[in-house]
Amino acid sequence: MERLVIEGGTVLPMTGQADVYENGVVLVEAGRIVYAGPRDGAPHLAGARRIDASGRIVMPGIVNTHCHAAMTLLRGYADDMRLMEWLQTKIWPAEARMTADDVYWGTALGAYEMLSGGITTFLDMYFPADAVARAIQDTGIRGIVARGIIGVGGPSEALSRLDESREAFHRWNGKAGGRITFMVGPHAPYTCPPDALQACAELADELGVGIHIHLSETRDEVEEARRNWGKSPIRHVYDLGLMKGRHVVAAHCVHVDDDDIAILAETGTGVCHCPVSNLKLASGRTPVAKMRRKGVAVGFGTDGASSENMLHILGSEMRIGAIQAKELEGDPAVYTAYDAVAMATIEAARVLGMESEIGSLEPGKKADLILIDAERPHLTPNHDVFALIAYSALPGDVVMTIVDGRIVYEDGRLTTMDGREIMARVREAAARLVRE
């Protein structure tokens, strides 16, 4: 791994709102941050490649807490439908036709898109796990693989998916220099009966990993849960023991009450906030500010490209999420630009249980960082750099993305794979998958 000296930019380590270093320096060695701060006091790093960051913002890589990356294959297909109708009549039938090769190329395209917009880490729930892991390896992104597990077809269906998850974990966990890690991924309480959820919990304990699950995404889901179990999906999962003593990452959590929020806070469950997908599917608005006041860690997620249509947090989830949080509480001061940037970086890392490794530019942490070109019309002038990022910056403003100290995206080009081949393969597969 080469040594890097990134100098002359506005450095945002995300260690506090006051920590903004104009004409700052970031030093990278052996894939980790050595220094991030003012030029004065920066140690000398011999034999390093020097990167001029003048006119650019240097900040931690963005963390996507919830994604279905391979669903790039279905971008723009079956839009403008209600969630369950969309899943049951369009998405699930198309997914049933996908091959492992399709998923590899779809995930590779998702990774390419994310890296181009500054996302360096993502938590993915999809299948098959081997194809997802291989795409993470080849594109250079950092990814957590949670093989989606559905148990409505009976115990044998869930067990086969659990076996696949276990085998993929032993093949891939820690590979690609540690960029590939795993969670267990029960899809949701409405697709996983209690015995399947218990089996997922047991596998998570066996492998020593966390759990990723969709919870309380729609009003219909919550109402059905109350009819079936007499309680909310979150209370149901909690009472089954899934959230006790394990790291759980819960996607959506839109329709929650005070009891649900108390459970999330008590158990340290991280919440993935996907505002654009939730708005587009008319699922509702997550009470983000209220959750955070109660001590719940919340990070932005994109969901899949078939519901959000883009796998970008900058200029999309971050901007819409910040505005929505203000509108929901009727108070523009309840949620700040810094809050939004934190929810895309260090707080998102906490959601994933990775805050000791990523999410901020601190000595010893993984060298996952991005450079944003601030010399753009929509980023001029700069009165508040956090406001620029939260409300004005766009994915195309990212000019360099670094993962593990390696430049994986630079000036519009993926450096690890042929981006044109990825797009061509996805176009070919997508045309076949939606042919009815």
From Swiss-Prot:
Catalyzes the deamination of 5-methylthioadenosine and S-adenosyl-L-homocysteine into 5-methylthioinosine and S-inosyl-L-homocysteine, respectively. Is also able to deaminate adenosine. GO terms for molecular function: 5'-methylthioadenosine deaminase activity; metal ion binding; S-adenosylhomocysteine deaminase activity. Pfam families: Amidohydro_1. It is an enzyme of class 3 (hydrolase). This is 5-methylthioadenosine/S-adenosylhomocysteine deaminase. Binds 1 zinc ion per subunit. CDD domains: ATZ_TRZ_like. It comes from Symbiobacterium thermophilum (strain DSM 24528 / JCM 14929 / IAM 14863 / T). Its cofactor is Zn(2+). It catalyses: S-adenosyl-L-homocysteine + H2O + H(+) = S-inosyl-L-homocysteine + NH4(+); S-methyl-5'-thioadenosine + H2O + H(+) = S-methyl-5'-thioinosine + NH4(+). Signal peptide: none annotated. Zn(2+) binds at residues 66, 68, 214, 303. InterPro entries: Amidohydro-rel, Deaminase_MtaD/DadD, Metal-dep_hydrolase_composite, Metal_Hydrolase, MTA/SAH_deaminase.
